[in-house]
Amino acid sequence: MAKKSMIEREKKRQRLVIKYAQKRQQLKTELKTTSFLEQKVNLNRKLQQLPRNSFPVRLHNRCLITGRPKGYLRDFGLSRHVLREMAHECLLPGVTKSSW
C-alpha cells in the first residue's frame, strides 16, 4: 500500500491538470498560429508560468485501490496484484483465468 501522502499528491496533480488544461491548450494554439517572435516569447513565458504540477507529463498512473505505481494495468486501473485477487474472487466480469 502506498503512503497516503503520495496518493493525495497524485490526486492533487490530476486536479491541477484538469484545471489548467483549457488554458494550456489555448496558449499552445496561439503559440502555433502567431508568427511574431516577440509574441511567441510572451506566450511561451505565460505557458512556463503555469504551475509545474499542472503538466500532464508529471502524472503517474496508480492503482485505484492500493495506490501502487508499478505493475499498473491501464485497462482496469489496477495493479497486477489487485487484479489477480479480484479475478480469483470473480469481481471482474468477463475476466477468466487462461488455460491451454
Curated annotation (Swiss-Prot):
Binds 16S rRNA, required for the assembly of 30S particles. HAMAP family: Ribosomal_uS14_1. PROSITE patterns: RIBOSOMAL_S14. The gene is rps14. This is Small ribosomal subunit protein uS14c. InterPro entries: Ribosomal_uS14, Ribosomal_uS14_bac/plastid, Ribosomal_uS14_CS. PANTHER family: 30S RIBOSOMAL PROTEIN S14 (PTHR19836), SMALL RIBOSOMAL SUBUNIT PROTEIN US14M (PTHR19836:SF19). It comes from the Eukaryota. Keywords: Chloroplast, Plastid, Ribonucleoprotein, Ribosomal protein, RNA-binding, rRNA-binding.
